[in-house]
Amino acid sequence: MIQTIRGFRDILPGETPLWQTIERAASQLFEDFGFQEIRLPLIERTELFARSIGEVTDIVEKEMYTFPDRKGENITLRPEATASVVRSYIQHKMYAADPIQKLYTMGPMFRRERPQKGRYRQFFQINAEVFGIASPYIDAQLILLLNELFKRLGLTDLTAHLNSLGCRECRPLFHRALTEFLVSKQDRLCSDCRRRMDKNPLRTLDCKVPGCREAMQDAPTTLDHLCSDCSDHFTTVKATLKAQGVDFLVDKTLVRGLDYYSRTAFEIQTTALGAQSAVAGGGRYDALIKELGGPEVPAIGFAIGLDRLAEVMAQLKGCPAPRGPDLFIIPLGPGAMEKAYLCSSRLNLVGIRSETDYNGKSLKSLMKRADKLNAGHALILDYRQPDKNAPVLRNMKTREQVTLGLEDPTDEVIKILTNEGTLRD
C-alpha cells in the first residue's frame, strides 16, 4: 500500500469544515480591512529565499526542499510566502500604479523539519502583507486584525508578544554588543551558534539548543539599543494597541526566524497544545523590497499557521459536523431512479443540496442512510405501484411527513423547504 511521505498528510472530509470556517472568516475580515487576494506559484528560484530569508538561517541551511531542474537551475518549494509576494510586487510593478498595496494569500508551504505534533513538512499558512505604509498605526492594525480574527473564531486563550528589532541605523550597535557577549560565552554555545557569531549574531537568539538558551539569558536586547525613531515607533504601536483594548506582552527575546524583519516583530502564542507555541507571527521588513531589486518601499506582514490553528480549535471546540444534505431522495421500483436523479439535479441547480441512491437499495436501508448523512428531509419516490403511491416528503428531525401530488414533486419540494426555512446555509 502506497502511503503519504513522512511529514505530509491528507486533510480528510471530517476535518475540512473546520479549515473552511477559518479560511472564510479570514477572507471576510481581510476584505473588510481592504485587502485583495493574490495567488502565487509553489516553486520559486532558490536565490529568492536565500536573499530574503537569509543564508545563515535554519530554513535556508537545513530545511528547504531545493533541487536542480533539467537545465541545472536550483529551484525551491516555497518555505514561506512573504518573499513570493514581494517578488510579485516587484515583477509586476504594482508600485507604479500605487505603492500602497494590501494583499493576502493562502496555501501550502514546505520545510524539511522534524515532524511533531502540530508541525508538518507540508504546512498551510494564511498570509497578509501591506506595502507602502511606514506608520506604526498599520503595525497596530495588523495585530488588531489578528486579534479580531481569533475572537471571531471563538479563541480567547491567546497572547500577543511584541518586540522591536531596530533598523539599519541602530542594529549595528546591537550587533556589536551581542557579538562581544557571544565571544565571552562561546565555550557554552553549540557549533551552529559559534559559526553564526560573526556572520549573523541575531540568529543565535533564535537557537533552540537548551545549553545555548541558558547561556543567552543575560544577552543584550534590541530594546536597549533602539535609536530614537525606532523607540518612538514602538511606543506608538504599544499605545495604539492599548487604546484599542488589545492585550500584549513585550518580549525582549522575540526575534523571529527570518533575517528580513526590522522594527516591530510580533507573535500570537497559545498554551492550548501544551507547550507555548505560536499560531501567528510577523513584523516589519522595510528593507526587503529594495534588497530584492525593487524601490525603497516600507512593508509589514504576518503569517497564520493554519494547521496549528485548526488543531487548537479542534481541541478547544471540536470539529463541526459535516453538513448534511437538505434532502435525500429515496427511489423505489422501476423508473424511480431516473426520476430521483432528475429531481436531485434540478434541486442542486437552484441551491437545495440533495442526494439520491444509485444502487437500488431497500426503503429500510435508504432511510438509515438518510439518517447517517444527517439529511434534513427524505423524499420517497415509490414507483412500485406508480398509480397508487404518491411521493412522500418526511422531515427527518420531527418525523412528520406530507404526501405530494403524483406528478413531478420537485416544485412542491422547493416550495415546502423554502417556506419551512430549514435549508442549510
UniProtKB/Swiss-Prot annotation:
Keyword hit for Protein biosynthesis: yes
Origin species: Desulforapulum autotrophicum (strain ATCC 43914 / DSM 3382 / VKM B-1955 / HRM2)
Subunit description: Homodimer.
InterPro entries: aa-tRNA-synth_II, aa-tRNA-synth_II/BPL/LPL, Anticodon-bd, Anticodon-bd_dom_sf, His-tRNA-ligase, HisRS-like_core, HisRS/HisZ
Primary enzyme class: ligase
Location in or out of the cell: Cytoplasm
GO aspect biological process, one term: histidyl-tRNA aminoacylation
Keywords, in A-Z order: Aminoacyl-tRNA synthetase, ATP-binding, Cytoplasm, Ligase, Nucleotide-binding, Protein biosynthesis
Assigned protein family: Belongs to the class-II aminoacyl-tRNA synthetase family.
Location (main, coarse): cytoplasm
Catalytic reaction annotation: tRNA(His) + L-histidine + ATP = L-histidyl-tRNA(His) + AMP + diphosphate + H(+)
Known EC number: 6.1.1.21
HAMAP family from the UniProt entry: His_tRNA_synth
MF GO annotations: ATP binding; histidine-tRNA ligase activity
UniProt protein name: Histidine--tRNA ligase
Entry's Gene Ontology cellular component terms: cytoplasm
Gene name per UniProt: hisS
